[in-house]
């Protein structure tokens, strides 16, 4: 009697191979999700070719997208400076789904490192969530897992917030307010898009 043993099928994907609907679904269900791991973030990086070289890799197992990495390689105007300072930045950390295994994440990190080794002198993943569960996996793939401290500013009063921000930065805030800047609570989608358009223009001209 023959016994049927299911075989897991894994696919390593680049940006053009990743199904947009599967990507969006992964963003919606992952506890590690941030805007910086979305296809929109990739498109934002791609819209600024003078400053960034975008990349995105994903791993699909048994027909399900399990994890994605999105980031960019820094780009300098000077070829010499570019050669010595080029680095790959993954803002927010990897996007990991609830069904992803250690093998999935390890393979994704190894492929990312392999694909970028000729483009960057090192890879920096700026994790916005608690990835301590995956610390061993990161280290197995050659990453140094370095804890960092978030800075918190007490905003219980305007005076206290101002003293914690610092005089120099507060000066720029006051100048912005003088020039017409305002605080918007619960911005609309249109306002958020307008903000990103301004960022694109800023990165393109500065």
What are these regions (language model features)?
Residues 2-22, 137-206:
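Acyltransferase donor/substrate-recognition loop-hinge adjacent to the catalytic core
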Residues 11-15, 28, 40-114:
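Conserved donor-binding loop and adjoining core beta-sheet/short helix segment
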Residues 27-42, 206:
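Conserved GNAT-fold acetyl-CoA-binding loop/helix
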Residues 54, 91, 120-122, 148-150, ...:
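Extracellular structured ligand-interaction cores
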Residues 58, 67-69, 121-127, 184-186:
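A structural signal for short, well-ordered beta-strand segments and their strand-loop junctions
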Residues 65, 88, 119, 144-147, ...:
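A short, structural micro-pattern
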Residues 74-76, 129-132, 158, 191:
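Short, solvent-exposed loop/turn segments at secondary-structure junctions
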Residues 103-147:
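Non-catalytic accessory segments adjacent to catalytic cores
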